[in-house]
Amino acid sequence: MTKKLTLKRKGKEPEPTNEVAASSEASDNEEEEDLLQAVKDPGEDTTDDEGIDQEYQSDSSEDLEFESDEEGNYLGRKKGDGSSEEEDDDGDEEGEEEDEEEDDSEDGESADDGDEEKPTTSKQNKSEDEPSSSKVSKKTQPPTKDLVKRDPSHPEYHDSDTSDEEDIRNTVGNIPMHWYDEYKHIGYDWDAKKIVKPPQGDQIDEFLRKIEDPNFWRTVKDPQTGQEVLITDEDIALIKRIISGRIPNKDHNEYEPWVEWFTSEVEKMPIKNVPDHKRSFLPSVSEKKRVGRMVHALKMGWMKTTEEVEREKQAKRGPKFYMLWETDTSREHMRRIHDPVSAPKRDLPGHAESYNPPPEYLFDERETKEWLKLKDEPHKRKLHFMPQKFTSLRAVPAYSRYLRERFLRCLDLYLCPRAKRVKLNIDAEYLIPKLPSPRDLQPFPTIESLVYRGHTDLVRSVSVEPKGEYIVSGSDDKTVKIWEIATGRCIRTIETEDVVRCVAWCPNAKLSIIAVATGNRLLLINPKVGDKVLVKKTDDLLAEEPSSDVIESERIKAAVQWATAEPAEQEKGVRVVINHFKPIRQVTWHGRGDYLATVMPEGANRSALIHQLSKRRSQIPFSKSKGLIQCVLFHPVKPCFFVATQHNIRIYDLVKQELVKKLLTNSKWISGMSIHPKGDNLLVSTYDKKMLWFDLDLSTKPYQTMRLHRNAVRSVAFHLRYPLFASGSDDQAVIVSHGMVYNDLLQNPLIVPLKKLQTHEKREDFGVLDVNWHPIQPWIFSTGADCTIRLYT
């Protein structure tokens, strides 16, 4: 239920005529005094702090109605007809300004008329109202001062910075109004009552207002009260001037004429032309006396010259020297050096540097050999010296490296820059990449299952049949042996004239051919194992010599000659012999089984040769030598040819006959390489204990460098079906790793070392010489210097 409070305000009457001015003004004064006495308490002071009477006048004759809830909170104002204050303000905003101007003009005219007739009316009132005591008391009150009419074009506080007298309806102060977003009220009025937020319309109401209300574009919301305020024409003009970059005050003239307070033209006549005084050109008596006193002081020695004063200051300063190193107790800021960083101190000597160290600190034969082996890499040594033992201190000789170590220490002090760095507290486990557990990456070989014994010298190479039933091995004992994988039995042994450097089984399952590199000859052998139909088909293919209409150049004839094997060799299974002019080191097959390539490191620009089996002809792909070729490889999908020199790997397009890419290994010597079955990743082994993984689509530099071995890595191999690769090294270890290559090009390969298989024996610093995967099963074969071939499953 709402309460209503009605306060009637006295309206302005029509302007009185001259005849009745006195009577009308008298009656008006009496009515105003009665109304003020009704509102004010008896004896209440009507003056403000400065002693000026305050008059409360109303500018409307209408009734004011205020609404409040049961708690007394202010809700709004209504007119006499029951309409809310908001509805009345929206409809009459435009007419209020005109009404105020008319009211002001009427008030001014009525006040002027009243002043003119004031003496007459005061006399009449005094004579008529003498019997009334109440009226006499009213007349005895001090007369109220007339209100000065203010120009509406100039605000009341136009020339003042004060804001204490502003019309503030919400007393919360200058705070963010969004603090009241969750409340029903928006603040408190002067009576400490809540100001309820006005009703908010929805988007439909706002859309209708945009269409129907012509003043919608100039209506803003007051954040203090939540009411909507209509922007006047003066405010719009001010906003436009600010947006256009002009001075907000339109009465200000920024192009006023310049007033020259002092002329810029040189005047001919001086401002003052007073003749010089006589004392301006006569010697000064005071200066004469001062000079006399100074001369007397110099004679008596009381006063010193500038040179003497400078010498005394120099003597007080002392020599310009400073400490090279700071003391332990004070921190000295040296000249031209801001906050220097002290040099690191040498480590204190330990027990190993004693002239009579304990026996456990002395090197044994193995430690001495390792210490001497790191001569080229002294930073990897645990100690920069070799501990020695003496019977007494007088038996200790002079340290031969003392001067060199002092010299290197001095170089470190003045050549190596020193800086302060904030130590980062980073957990070491955070830096380690999260790798899956090896148990989740099975299957992979974990144990040694079979050992194939039969060779009497180094077994340099091993190759597996495409169906995975047999393997072939080549050794320095000049024999080629064919083994059955399941039983470990040697089925056939083929003797050769020279050391067998490399063997390779043809990857085409429709042919049964083994390429054997022995000395200067490349032998194509039919092993006569497996399917008899396949063996017979292979013999028929190799027995036919195709007709060749192409005339080979003398350069090719001098490098290679094709020939049919002798009858004695035919019995061993040799069908075709390809003679080279230099020893062959490596032989590799193309994926289709028709092409094979050989490498002769001593052949200069003819080191690499490509042979075609079906046409029995050879070709030299390179006319110039780009380095000492170590090994070659065919791309499994594209017509590309990989050539590895000592330091780099070049990829050539055989169709376009151009260089496609050059891979930078940053290694001392490349030993071998293997390509992923998909052809996008390459694995390279080096003699400097590294394995390099190249992503051919990513960069010409290694994607990852793996240092898993302690000695030279001699061979690497990818599995054809499983995401596995392996490496063999001279440390007698075969390390099996997981290498998953994803079809998503945005995802990097996953490389996880899985198992270290170390069962080979070391002979003459050689360990594992070759590794090769089973084509179907996750098994791996390794050959070593211990004359054995080992199978890990």
Swiss-Prot record:
* GO BP field: maturation of 5.8S rRNA from tricistronic rRNA transcript (SSU-rRNA, 5.8S rRNA, LSU-rRNA); maturation of LSU-rRNA from tricistronic rRNA transcript (SSU-rRNA, 5.8S rRNA, LSU-rRNA); regulation of hemocyte proliferation
Subcellular location, record wording: Nucleus, Nucleolus; Nucleus, Nucleoplasm
Span list, region Disordered: 1-168
Q: Where is the composition biased (Basic and acidic residues)?
A: 117-129, 146-161
The record's Gene Ontology cellular component field reads: nucleoplasm; PeBoW complex; preribosome, large subunit precursor
**Positions of WD repeats:** 454-495, 497-535, 579-621, 624-662, 665-704, 708-747, 763-793
Note the Gene3D superfamilies from the entry: YVTN repeat-like/Quinoprotein amine dehydrogenase (2.130.10.10)
The yes or no answer to whether the keyword rRNA processing is present is: yes
UniProt key word Nucleus: yes
Indicate, by first and last residue, each region the UniProt record lists as having compositional bias (Polar residues). Answer: 133-143
Q: Where is the composition biased (Basic residues)?
A: 1-11
- Cite the Pfam families for this sequence: BOP1NT, WD40
Q: Where is the composition biased (Acidic residues)?
A: 44-53, 60-72, 83-116
Named from the GO MF annotations, one term is: ribonucleoprotein complex binding
Looking at the record's lineage, which domain of life comes first?
Eukaryota
Q: Which UniProt keywords apply?
A: Nucleus, Repeat, Ribosome biogenesis, rRNA processing, WD repeat
Function (record text): Required for maturation of ribosomal RNAs and formation of the large ribosomal subunit.
Q: Which family does it belong to?
A: Belongs to the WD repeat BOP1/ERB1 family.
Protein name (database record): Ribosome biogenesis protein BOP1 homolog
Protein's organism = Drosophila ananassae
Its ancestry begins with: Eukaryota, Metazoa, Ecdysozoa, Arthropoda, Hexapoda
